[in-house]
């Protein structure tokens, strides 16, 4: 299994629709020449953007977090260019980009160091072979202060690994519960 390069990522995005919308280079400034947290193609990965749809966790109902019986009541929906995450809390968001993962590829997501150095951790599970959809992102604010996430800027990097052998059963074959997800998707059992 080997990690894939910028050339491969560009080819797969442009010819196979693996990433949509796709940025072939690294974007570091907006149209007004203001600095951004970078996104787009890097040497051995793709830096994704966070869309402007957020679900911010709140415990106004004194609920218990149960992945088998998760309630949307635990979140406040926000549509904004920024998301303020309360201290020691978290928020869900989604990528701007829609992914279509090839059958021979496993994709792993890592948080960007810009956020990690501020105590904001990005968590995403692997994107399995033949999975497609918007990626649901989880941002944990590990600090005792409110933390800010910027929409339409880089938040995490996707690394693509291609196997020497194609899997026998893909996520698509199994009819995975998150197949084709759009928007911020809560846990399903």
Curated annotation (Swiss-Prot):
**According to its UniProt record, in which pathway does this protein act?**
Pyrimidine metabolism; dUMP biosynthesis; dUMP from dCTP (dUTP route): step 1/2
What does it do? Catalyzes the deamination of dCTP to dUTP.
Biological process according to GO: dUMP biosynthetic process; dUTP biosynthetic process; nucleobase-containing small molecule interconversion
Gene encoding it?
A: dcd
Q: Quaternary structure?
A: Homotrimer.
Cite a single Pfam family from the UniProt record: DCD
Entries under HAMAP family matching the protein: dCTP_deaminase
Q: Give the keywords, sorted.
A: Hydrolase, Nucleotide metabolism, Nucleotide-binding
Q: Which family does it belong to?
A: Belongs to the dCTP deaminase family.
What are the catalytic residues? 138 (proton donor/acceptor)
Q: Does the keyword Translocase apply?
A: no
Q: For dCTP, which residues are the binding ones? A: 112-117, 136-138, 157, 171, 181
Catalytic reactions of this protein? dCTP + H2O + H(+) = dUTP + NH4(+)
EC number of this enzyme: 3.5.4.13
Annotated TM spans: none
EC supergroup of this enzyme: hydrolase
**What name goes with this protein?**
dCTP deaminase
Entry GO MF terms: dCTP deaminase activity; nucleotide binding
Lineage of the organism: Bacteria, Pseudomonadati, Pseudomonadota, Gammaproteobacteria, Cellvibrionales
User: Which InterPro entries has this protein been placed in?
Assistant: dCTP_deaminase, dUTPase-like_sf, dUTPase_trimeric
Q: Which organism is it from?
A: Saccharophagus degradans (strain 2-40 / ATCC 43961 / DSM 17024)
